[in-house]
A protein has these predicted regions:
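Catalytic metal-binding/acid-base residues of hydrolase active sites
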Residues: 15-16, 48, 210
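A secondary-structure boundary/capping signal
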Residues: 12, 45-46, 82-83, 206
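Helical element adjacent to the flavin cofactor pocket in flavoenzyme catalytic cores
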Residues: 1-32, 36-40
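Flavin (primarily FAD) binding-site architecture
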Residues: 41-62, 79
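Conserved flavin/dinucleotide-binding core of flavoenzymes
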Residues: 25-27, 37, 44, 52, ...
Length: 247
């Protein structure tokens, strides 16, 4: 994809500061001072973050109201890596569910051919909110203690000897502020005249939250991206046809 777009056209570490939409096109300005001018602009941020963008003119009031009311969840992960799949030696497949937490679901995500063994743990909801406020060493401790308790092993067990421990708190990320996808207020998504996800002027909106398939997942993001690209292409073709007709 990078080769298709052209690596010179991919600008990393260039957060968008403002978007100015006019009848003739869009100007996007980054926090690094770069300006990009185009006929159309596709915004793929979660709608929760629209309020962090300086969009001129502002989005319609109804669209702002919906975007400002969307919320992202506490959806966190802890990946505990080991040099052996010790849970299999105990007769378990690594999948578990817990109503006590902090881990509510975990599964074996090992890659056996590479001798990489891991349990991926999901720490979500209210438990995830509390877990995310802990210090890193505390998050590690409570996850290992829970795994040890579930599998009925002691302090000398391999569960307490991971070779790596990774965690991801999406609420801590500036450009996501949560996961999986923004949730709208009841009824916002189903109203026939809802502006949610609809284009405004030369601005088009894509993201997994707008997908009709696999909403909240990468597949949903791809589906929405394809639809957004088609929407822009159709709009440009219609504009070109209109210009030819006038001429």
């Amino acid at each position: 994809m990078a080769n298709l777009v052209g690596e010179s056209n991919i600008h990393l570490s260039s957060p968008v500061a403002s978007i100015r939409d006019t009848e003739t096109g869009v100007t996007v300005t980054t926090t690094t001072g770069k300006n990009f001018v185009a006929k159309k602009c596709i915004i793929s941020l979660p709608s929760t973050l629209y309020q962090d963008l300086n969009i001129s003119p502002p989005l319609p009031a109804a669209a702002r109201e919906i975007a400002n009311s969307t919320r992202l969840g506490h959806y966190n992960k802890a990946i505990v890596c080991y040099d052996t799949p010790w849970w299999r030696d105990l007769g378990y497949n690594g999948f578990l569910m817990s109503y006590k937490g902090p881990v509510i679901v975990a599964r074996d995500t090992s890659v056996d051919e590479k001798r990489f063994y891991a349990l991926t743990c999901f720490v979500n909801g209210d438990e995830g909110a509390r877990w995310g406020e802990m210090y890193p060493h505390e998050r590690r401790r409570v996850v290992l203690e829970q795994l040890a308790g579930i599998y009925g092993v002691g302090l000398d067990a391999p569960v307490y000897q991971p070779i790596e421990f990774f965690d991801q708190i999406w609420k801590h990320e500036t450009y996501s502020k949560g996961a999986l996808a923004p949730i709208t207020a009841l009824g916002d998504y189903t109203k026939p005249d809802s502006p949610y996800g609809r284009s405004v002027g030369n601005l088009h909106f894509v993201g997994t939250e707008f997908s009709k398939e696999w909403k909240g997942y990468m597949e949903g993001a791809l589906w929405s991206g394809e639809q957004g690209a088609k929407e822009v292409a159709d709009a440009l073709l219609a504009s070109k046809a209109s210009t030819l007709a006038v001429n």
